[in-house]
């Protein structure tokens, strides 16, 4: 924060994540979601550390890419050109860059290598966590752009017999790099028509996703931290 690009350019921004709260979200929300919607093999690979890292990199991802652009001789914030499509594109961009950033850290040895096998299953469970804030909201549409794109590439499949989704990690670097290029290109050019086309192609929830969400009513959407200092 803050979200105002003029303030960010002039003064910078600050990110704060509380790891104990993130761990509580992982154990109380993300893991129960995964049990309902992911394959048994993927549930076994879940990692609180991968969850924390990808959320951290999501927030960093918001600050990567263009903020102010010039289109047709007019300079303004990216969101002014993408209008109502901006938030969904931006959320999808931040998620996509979170995976690329984390994979980069893995490749550079900055993160333990054994975390890699946990990354895609944890990310996939995280998509279901996020989408529950609202299918029609920016985060929900942004999630479905990623989900449907990755499913098209074969990185996510659905087992009709078990009604569970399966993560396939082969070439995930290539898949996320391709999606990041599409999203960043839209933002760099302020291309409203391309944003609209991408959302129309990938932004709608599938029947399988909708059905999976009906099995999550017993899982909290979020947690409510209680701070002893204000009791």
Residue ranges and their predicted role:
Residues 77-87:
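Short beta-alpha connecting loops at secondary-structure transitions
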Residues 99-195, 201:
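Long, well-structured alpha-helical subdomains associated
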Residues 1-79:
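Active-site-adjacent "gating/activation" loops or surface patches in catalytic cores
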